[in-house]
Amino acid sequence: MGQLDTRQKLAILADAAKYDASCASSGTSKRDSRGGKGVGSTEGMGICHAYAPDGRCISLLKILLTNSCIFDCHYCINRKNSNVRRARFTAQEVVQLTLAFYKRNYIEGLFLSSGIIHSSNYTMEQLVEVARSLREDHDFRGYIHLKTIPDADPELVHQAGLHADRVSINVELPTVGGLERLAPDKSAMRIEGAMKGMKGAIEDGRDARKKYRSAPKFAPAGQSTQMIVGADAASDGDIISRASTLYDRFRLRRVYYLSLIHI
């Protein structure tokens, strides 16, 4: 990978993020920086790029940390063997970009996902560090949506919920057979295990807030997921049944659908 400046990285990694549909910020509590405290806001302002299910226009900086990946999911343009131009941000580059875009009134928050680099744990550490730095180092009060990695250490995934408004773990495909065939590096059992753990942590966080007002919020906008439609032999009934099961088992805020893009 040649040396790229920030503008070039942004062009590549913002374009690569367009294949992720799960980008709505409904459900979070309102926070702002009026009164001179912190920076950022979850309330609508600036350039709107998406609509939340409650009808509000929202603007998010939607990027990947990197489009490099050690996995070879056949449906993904960023898969290991895909011939695309690669780029990578450091955690601090994403932090500074988010702050710069917010202060220019371009965005209300950040949607951050990533390809897998080095290992699932390493990548998850970088994603969490972005959110941690925004919240703790810069008192950022805007919206943060983090894509989490089911193969990562559960403690790292848990840390994501301490800093993000919403977290999401992609189920990828409607059927287990499709996942085994098209994404052999991924496991439906591990994905659902991570979603179950997140559901429990969200519920524990809500219970703690009921008992203790000082208890920290944990993913107040809940968790969501995304599945690709058209990549396997799943019927409409299979897709609807799968989504219904996910809503019931994991109390998801939303299941997003992305049509297969032939690459």
Regions found by a protein language model. Give the residues of each.
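Short alpha-helical segments and helix-capping/turn motifs at coil-helix boundaries
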Residues: E43-G46, V94-L97, D151-E155, I240-S241
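Eukaryotic partner-binding/assembly regions in large regulatory complexes
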Residues: Q226, S244-Y247, L252
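Flexible, acidic/Gly-rich N-terminal and inter-domain linker regions that tether
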Residues: M1-S68
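Catalytic cores of alpha/beta
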Residues: D153-L162, A233-L246
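Core AdoMet radical
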Residues: R79-V94, Y102-L127, S133-P154, G161-Y212, ...
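Local cysteine-cluster metal-coordination motifs and their immediate loop/turn environment
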Residues: S68-N78
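Conserved small/polar residues in nucleotide/adenosyl-binding loops
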Residues: I261-I263
